Amino acid sequence: MLDFIGQANKKYNFEEKFAALLSNTTHSVSREIKEGFVSAPKGCYIQLEKIATKYVLDNISTSYDRTSGLVVRAASFTEDTGLPLTLGNFLDYYHLDPRAIYSKKLCFARLCVCARVVDDFAEPLEETLTKAFARFAVVDSRRWIRFLLDLLPKLDDTNFSQLSPIEQRMLQMFYVTIWGKAAEDWNSEEVLDNLYALSDSSVLLGELQTLLQYRYDHIDFIDEPVDVGFDCPLDLHCTYTRDQLLVALDFPKPATVREGVKWLPEKQLDVFFVTLNKADKDYSPTTMYNDYSINENLFHWQSQSTTAENSATGQRYIHHREKGSRVLLFVREFKTDSRFGGAAAYTYLGTVNYVRHEGSRPMNITWKLDRPIPARFLKKTNKLIVG
């Protein structure tokens, strides 16, 4: 097929057109164009002439890659579309991921101020919340979102220490997402000041609620609770940052976890953090573990290089059912988000059970998942699938 690209209208959305052809990539459309569309579907080939490439890259750069392009679109949004300028309308009309805004360290309310379509504002937590919005932009747990949407409008009237254990865990997940550490005491002055200050940032708090509702409305899979031996708020196949999932498991210092495994003796849980595609610059030869799904029910996992099969840890992996412990599997494709920046979040694949192993230091273990990997994840987790 031949397509002739000339000086298109500056508001024409080339990025959307090419993104529709590249659903399998984690890279930006601009990067795909520059690298020759390496993520095009199997059997497809996309070639742009030099001048056409420049037109398309310039269009994308001035439209969405730069803050200035977003500001221009916000300024004329209602005139161009006939729709009120809201976060949801803006994202849906331009087919944007919320992180296209929040990765630029910009909140939507500030974007609208820059576009001169709303009055300026000054709020104490603007910088703090704006940094957190990119992390909230990937939240996809219905249970957690419902809890937050119920809690946020009544922060000033809530006794946080009186919340149920599972509600306090969900609040911890919220707290660590914004302030980067767990709350040690719900009655401490620092914690209360932080939470109550949210009500003094009404514009940003309102945007957070809007973002959460937007995420809730766009969840396209069925999640469900996972039995881990206590009332845990983590739901199957949902996305969590390392800090969020660790505080949900009652581990209060997530920043201290540097390895891809964590044993929680009080909960009798082994937690595995798996990065499927490891870059040489991010991992040493001793941490380039070979992890992948064999099929929808089995997962191949390589232990740390120091773990021997006859060690206490190795024996716990092999005999976890007899010993009464559980193994939780969290998986991500890459360490960093190459499109929007920052650490990539993990998908919760649930509990797994030992099947067999080979070798020692490291151990190559095959695990059976209690719930099968959904088809939409399987292509990313299974290195044996081509195209």
Feature annotation, model-predicted:
Residues 1-14:
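SF2 helicase/translocase ATPase core recognition
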Residues 6-9, 334, 359:
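Residues that form or immediately flank small-molecule/cofactor binding pockets and catalytic motifs
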Residues 11-158:
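Long, largely alpha-helical accessory region at the distal end of helicase-like NTP-driven motors
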Residues 81, 99, 154-161, 181-183, ...:
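Short, surface-exposed beta-strand/loop "edge" segments at domain boundaries and coil↔beta transitions
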Residues 114-118, 122, 126-134, 234-345:
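Acidic, glycine-rich low-complexity segments with interspersed aromatic residues
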Residues 168-271, 277-278:
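Charge-dense, extended regions
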Residues 338-387:
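Compact mixed alphabeta submodule
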